[in-house]
């Protein structure tokens, strides 16, 4: 666990994380940075992507907000894949997720 249970409970559904895979694949303890992309390439999956989710007491275990798929190309290195996932997925869905969560919070007031 990265943040304490008390902290994530206090800010329930107000902390967003972005993870460089399509959760539930390649997530949880030990899956961060290039490790995620190395695991996807080693497994031989054809599609990966990024997921935004709310943070809870389980690493990468919170409610999913948004996902975007990215194709894995023949000859990809972990670094190639990391760059493509950031550019094609992470950088697109993070601002959209923040906007969605903000709008949902405002509409519930």
Label the predicted regions:
Residues 1-107:
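Donor/substrate-binding cores of folate-linked one-carbon enzymes
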């Amino acid at each position: 666990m990265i943040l304490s249970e008390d902290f994530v409970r206090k800010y329930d559904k107000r902390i967003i994380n972005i993870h460089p895979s399509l959760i539930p694949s390649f997530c949880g303890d030990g899956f961060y940075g290039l490790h995620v992309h190395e695991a996807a390439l080693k497994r031989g999956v054809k599609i990966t992507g990024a997921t935004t989710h709310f943070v809870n007491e389980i690493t990468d275990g919170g409610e999913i907000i948004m996902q975007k798929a990215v194709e894995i190309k023949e000859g990809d290195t972990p670094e190639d894949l990391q760059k493509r996932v950031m550019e094609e997925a992470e950088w697109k869905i993070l601002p959209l997720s923040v906007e969605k969560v903000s709008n949902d919070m405002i509409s519930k007031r």
